[in-house]
């Protein structure tokens, strides 16, 4: 993989959303200094007010360098001491994944985006076939205005794929989805897909938006 990502999903305690965002901003400053690209994305429809704290690296070596830097970091010792003394949220899940497109770099995600995310659990031995289907769909979705990124799960998300559609704003998302209605190439693709062997199950489908870096 090129673009390697770790995702930490947090939920703020009641009345603590602002404090959690402040804590994430402090963590992001440390992670950035140690070589990671950081984005903070709030879930929207289809979720339960979760916030993704996302770390990205260009490759495995950069990923490992950041991990090693954390081991002896006084900044992290101080950060976790402060956070533990006044916790503002609870981590609900964490997982790692790699972008199947090896030309994509972590810096390609710098900026603010709106996301539509589908999470799939693939049947054993069917990962390559699912990627091929995803890539066929990718061409149609990009013609409709989406930027498509496909992640294959690693630690914490074995047998999972995250199919991510990215847009500059909500208006762009709406315009893209409008192009995928009845009579469109996407509608035809979905009809054909319904006749294929089932090799994966969709387990989650939600929108999100960048709220910090």
Segments (PLM) and residue ranges:
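Short S/T/G/P-rich N-terminal loop/turn motif that feeds into the first structured element of a domain
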Residues: 1-213
């Amino acid at each position: 993989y090129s673009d390697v990502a770790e995702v930490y999903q947090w939920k703020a305690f009641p009345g603590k959303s602002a404090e959690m965002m402040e804590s994430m901003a402090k963590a992001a400053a440390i992670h950035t200094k140690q070589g990671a690209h950081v984005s903070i994305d709030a879930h929207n429809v289809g979720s339960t007010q979760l916030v993704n704290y996302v770390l990205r690296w260009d490759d495995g070596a950069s990923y490992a360098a950041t991990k090693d830097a954390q081991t002896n970091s006084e900044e992290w010792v101080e950060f976790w001491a402060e956070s533990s003394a006044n916790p503002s949220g609870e981590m609900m899940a964490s997982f790692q994944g790699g972008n199947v497109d090896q030309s994509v770099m972590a810096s390609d995600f710098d900026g603010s985006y709106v996301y539509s995310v589908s999470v799939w659990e693939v049947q054993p031995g069917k990962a390559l076939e699912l990627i091929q289907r995803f890539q066929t769909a990718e061409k149609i979705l990009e013609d409709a205005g989406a930027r498509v990124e496909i992640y294959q799960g690693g630690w914490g998300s074995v047998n999972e794929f995250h199919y991510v559609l990215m847009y500059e704003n909500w208006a762009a998302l709406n315009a893209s989805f409008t192009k995928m209605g009845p009579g469109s190439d996407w509608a035809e693709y979905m009809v054909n897909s319904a006749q294929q062997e089932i090799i994966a199950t969709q387990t989650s489908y939600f929108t999100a938006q960048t709220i910090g870096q």
